[in-house]
UniProtKB/Swiss-Prot annotation:
Transit peptide listed as a keyword: no
Superkingdom as given in the UniProt entry: Eukaryota
Compartment(s) of residence: Secreted
Organism: Rhizopus stolonifer (Rhizopus nigricans)
Record note on quaternary structure: Homohexamer.
Tissue and organ distribution: Expressed by mycelium-forming spores.
Protein's name in the database: Alpha-(1-6)-linked fucose-specific lectin
GO cellular component: extracellular region
Major place of residence: secreted
Length: 28
């Protein structure tokens, strides 16, 4: 199950946190 309009998956190597870059553009 993938979120809608996932452009890319941003992974932070420091926190190992992956956030999907959605259309929302939260910038989180």
């Amino acid at each position: 199950i993938d979120p809608v309009n996932v452009k890319k998956l941003q992974c932070d190597g420091d926190t190992y946190k992956c956030t999907a870059d959605l259309d929302f553009g939260d910038g989180r």
